[in-house]
A protein has these predicted regions:
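The structured alpha-helical core of multi-pass membrane proteins
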Residues: 1-610
Length: 610
């Protein structure tokens, strides 16, 4: 009986594993089909304008064969080798893109700039599955960790890569649709222009689905399409200015025209989706003003949509079309942004190989040298286009970088003020024992921006002095956004402890930048109360008091500190902090972004001198 039972259990486990594998394969195939439009839409429309974009004079058969050779090796080296085989493995818990690679580097080395976003030591680290920097660091890592200039340059590189990707999302709808309709053309690097998009869109799909779609469909289709165009142009050497449509047989010309136009419209989705992803990453890491982010899938947290970002892209795209007027200038701008994003990816990927993967320096050189030479050649080609429209992505990137820097500077100044004026536990006791101060029924979550263990911000003293009260059970809550994509549910509520006076506690809620935050749906209040009863509360009486406070009502209190810019404030602070206040006033409140009901929100305003 024992042996028979063992065999049956083994067969059940084996059958379950097979069903799981089948489900995984079928899901990957479905996702691979979806990537054909969302991720690779721009890449498959490149035959519309690659040949016509070239300034050829009396081309010969050798010229066309040479051009096709460059196309083939560009697709193979950048598309297959760089992105499919290497870059897709440099994901941060399923999230891709330049900012995700920067996050990955920050997890394995002390190279972050923001103190509030640092990777905690083994003693401070709360999340069980987060990598802790350990072992003997290499020379490169020691150099970057010890040099603030190198760390700032690395952050600037990641920010520029993200901003260039957003600039790509602005230019893509214009160049793709206009190319399908009237032959407006992009630059030569567009042969592989969507390779970066498939990396940034990794959070929307999966690594295996992207690899399946590219290798089984996209790559062979493009190789054959360009080969067919080249064969036609060898026999019709003067037709390169309209190489795609003249290559199409006349009976199917109009159906192909309609399909190409529709495909060009869909092609814009790849960079638009990538823009949503990188904006969401930067918002959660507090490098960008808060915008609304909607999760469009219950199964994949990486599938997001931002209405405000979408409208911003629409307005900028229309502005680009109206401002340029000439499609060639749009193409010039497009070429600059595409190749610079590729170059930044190459640099960050090299650092990932050396610092995280521990790849031998010889293998890294075999990767870096060929791709650096190839992409440097493309950079030299597009540099001539900067004055003829290529300045647009630089202008967009500088504007976005200015927004990010202004937001970061203001947030950092607030953090410094909180650290310098924090309310100690002794001071809290004095405030609560002051004349006329009462404890009122209910459970209060008092939010603190402190990330290093200090729960009590200056807003607390301002609140007690003016309201003359504090809830019977008050939990000082810190939201800790870690430089990881997702946090396991069991690691969500951490550092639960008592903070001196009766009924006053502290805890930390941990989230990664790809996590959806919804306090009501996730019942965070219930999780915190459960953690208090399990880890802190002594005796039934205190436990019942906590439950009674929750039943009496939950309120979420958040301080809203503003800068008071006076006449004696230095000019640099006056400009940057004024810019931050403008951004802060225009962006969304943090509490609605957490899914907290309107009737439970209280914001306490406080001014302090800059």
């Amino acid at each position: 009986m024992s042996s028979s039972h063992t065999v049956t259990v083994s067969m059940d486990v084996e059958a379950g594993q097979k069903n799981k594998d089948k489900k995984g394969i079928s899901q990957d195939l479905i996702l691979a089909y979806k990537t054909l439009g969302v991720v690779f839409g721009g890449l498959v429309t490149s035959p519309l304008y690659v040949y016509p974009s070239m300034n050829l004079t009396n081309p010969t058969e050798e010229d066309y064969l040479g051009i096709y050779s460059i196309m083939f090796w560009t697709l193979t080296l950048i598309g297959v080798v760089k992105y499919i085989c290497i870059a897709l493995n440099a994901d941060d818990h399923g999230e891709g893109g330049t900012f995700a690679m920067y996050s990955l580097l920050c997890q394995h080395a002390n190279i972050g700039i923001l103190p509030s976003k640092k990777i905690y030591t083994e003693e401070e680290n709360l999340i069980s599955n987060q990598p802790v920097v350990a072992g003997r660091p290499g020379r490169l890592r020691r150099f970057i960790e010890s040099s603030i200039i190198a760390r700032r340059l690395l952050l600037l590189t990641a920010i520029l890569g993200m901003c260039m990707l957003i600039g790509d999302g602005i230019l893509t709808p214009a160049i793709s649709v206009l190319s399908a309709i009237d032959g407006l053309r992009g630059p030569f690097p567009s042969v592989s222009k969507r390779a970066e998009a498939m990396f940034a869109d990794l959070g929307h799909f999966s690594k295996r689905s992207i690899q399946i779609a590219f290798m089984s469909s996209i790559y062979p289709s493009l190789v054959l399409t360009y080969a067919g165009q080249t064969a036609y142009l060898i026999n019709n050497v003067d037709d390169f200015s309209d190489g795609f449509y003249k290559f199409v047989p006349r009976p199917v010309y109009w159906p192909m025209f309609i399909i190409a136009t529709l495909a060009a419209i869909v092609a814009s989705q790849s960079l638009i989706s990538a823009t949503f992803s990188v904006i969401k990453q930067s918002v959660v890491l507090d490098y960008f003003p808060r915008v609304k982010v909607v999760h469009t899938s219950k199964d994949k947290e990486g599938e997001v949509y931002s209405p405000e970002t979408n409208y911003m892209l629409m307005l900028l795209c229309v502005g680009v079309i109206l401002g340029f007027g000439d499609g060639k200038d749009i193409g010039n701008a497009f070429g600059v942004v595409v190749i610079l994003v590729m170059l930044i990816t190459t640099i960050l990927l090299t650092l990932v190989m050396l610092i995280i993967w521990g790849t031998h320096v010889v293998l890294v050189a075999l990767y870096l040298v060929p791709f650096l030479l190839l992409e440097a050649t493309y950079v030299s080609a597009v540099c001539t286009k900067i004055l003829r429209g290529g300045w647009v992505p630089f202008a967009v990137s500088v504007a976005l970088a200015a927004v990010m820097f202004g937001w970061y500077y203001g947030r950092q100044r607030k953090t410094e003020y909180e650290v310098a004026n924090k309310v100690t536990l002794e001071r809290l006791g004095e405030l609560l024992s002051g004349p006329g101060v009462r404890r009122v029924p209910g459970l209060c979550f008092f939010y603190s921006n402190r990330q290093d263990g200090g729960w009590l911000t200056p807003v607390l003293a301002h609140y007690i002095r003016n309201m003359r009260s504090l809830h019977e059970v008050t939990v000082f809550l810190t939201l800790r956004y870690l430089l990881v994509a997702k946090v396991d549910g069991k690691d969500r509520v951490q550092a639960v402890r008592r903070l001196g006076p009766a009924g006053v506690y502290g805890c930390t809620i941990q989230y990664g930048y790809a996590d959806a935050i919804d306090f009501e749906e996730d019942d965070i209040a219930g999780q915190v109360v459960g953690a208090l009863r399990e880890r802190v509360v002594d005796g039934e009486e205190e436990g019942e008091r906590v439950e009674a406070a929750r039943a009496a009502g939950v309120v979420h209190v958040r301080g809203k500190m503003r800068f008071h810019v006076g006449k004696d404030t230095r000019l640099f602070d006056r400009v940057l902090l004024g810019f931050y206040e403008l951004l802060h006033g225009a962006c969304r409140s943090a509490l609605p972004a957490l899914g907290i009901p309107l009737q439970q929100r209280v914001e306490i305003g406080m001014l302090y001198k800059a």
